[in-house]
């Protein structure tokens, strides 16, 4: 769920508050439209697509609880998660790891969505 995703982000990117990722680019934090503006925004587009795929499986990705572990910046989804929990955990894990590897460009935070995301 979104609370667990926030905690996963904190695991992989402890130096930056989670909410910095909630209004970034064209895909981080809102529906998503247009071409991703950078690598971090592309991480969010992939995450959105992953949630969409989980939804098509009959899952509720924003609310599905799952089990995972964070150890020294490394995330692991619990192998005993059910079908939906496993799918959503994997979406969040991949995104949190992607965030950790992508540069954060301050100018791409809180952009003019209507102008830049067509």
From Swiss-Prot:
The lineage of its organism: Eukaryota, Metazoa, Chordata, Craniata, Vertebrata. Its EC number is 3.1.1.4. It comes from the Eukaryota. Snake venom phospholipase A2 (PLA2) that shows anticoagulant activity, has cytotoxic activity and affects neuromuscular transmission in vitro. PLA2 catalyzes the calcium-dependent hydrolysis of the 2-acyl groups in 3-sn-phosphoglycerides. Ca(2+) binds at residues 27, 29, 31, 48. One of its GO terms (molecular function) is phospholipid binding. This is Basic phospholipase A2 nigexine. It is found in: Secreted. Disulfide bonds join 11-70, 26-117, 28-44, 43-98, 50-91, 59-84, 77-89. It comes from Naja pallida (Red spitting cobra). PROSITE patterns: PA2_ASP (PS00119), PA2_HIS (PS00118).
